């Protein structure tokens, strides 16, 4: 791409993310933007064949190759760790490996419930957006995001910033609302005056779980944030 390439790289990465999001969505999966050139997809219910199709279709459209590691675990964190391990076993990003679909011999697709928490900050527009400069809010949001990532990781969950003042956490099916309350308490002590609420959705795939979580969050908002946590099966 030459020396004047940074803007081209950003455009390419954005287009690849959009492509992958649409492809995984079409199979009821969801892609989270992690470090731009590394993405995490929740692909429960998606077959090996369809993972391969996504890789092949991407390479027909873009001047890059892509590799995927598929992990399975008792918790989202354990699944992600396994996905990284099976991919690393095929060669690092600096090796001669160009593309691979790696998994550990599990029966795929994985069929089972997915649990998602949609978290946001109460009255964020009034207490932050309308008062402070954007960049100050951006810094504080990232500090809060780091706290949530670290605390959700402790219970085996993955947490991602989802724009605005919204965070999506892919949670273990065993997670109890009391664990979420503990995470909120820790967050609110560190990031005053912010208070959190969350809708929790459980579905047969991640899109269904997110949809149910969104419905719960909407109901909490309509109740003027009197409830902190609501769950919908």
Report residues per predicted region.
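Regulatory and interdomain segments flanking nucleotide-handling catalytic cores
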Residues: 1-233
């Amino acid at each position: 791409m030459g020396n004047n390439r940074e803007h081209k790289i950003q455009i390419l990465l954005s287009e690849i993310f959009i492509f992958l999001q649409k492809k995984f969505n079409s199979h009821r999966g969801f892609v989270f933007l992690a470090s731009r050139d590394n993405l995490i997809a929740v692909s429960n219910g998606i077959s090996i064949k369809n993972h391969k199709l996504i890789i092949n279709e991407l390479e027909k459209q873009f001047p890059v190759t892509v590799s995927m590691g598929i992990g399975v675990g008792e918790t989202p964190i354990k699944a992600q760790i396994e996905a990284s391990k099976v991919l690393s076993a095929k060669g690092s990003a600096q090796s001669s490996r160009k593309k691979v679909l790696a998994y550990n011999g599990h029966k795929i697709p994985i069929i089972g419930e997915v649990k998602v928490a949609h978290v946001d900050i109460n009255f964020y527009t009034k207490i932050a957006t309308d008062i402070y400069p954007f960049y100050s809010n951006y810094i504080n949001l990232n500090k809060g995001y780091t706290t949530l990532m670290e605390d959700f990781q402790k219970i085996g969950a993955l947490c991602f910033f989802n724009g605005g003042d919204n965070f999506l956490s892919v949670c273990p099916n065993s997670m109890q609302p009391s664990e979420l309350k503990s995470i909120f308490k820790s967050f609110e002590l560190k990031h005053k005056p912010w208070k959190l609420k969350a809708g929790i959705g459980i579905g047969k795939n991640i899109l269904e779980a997110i949809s149910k979580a969104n419905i719960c969050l909407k109901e909490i908002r309509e109740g003027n944030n009197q409830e902190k946590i609501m769950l919908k099966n």
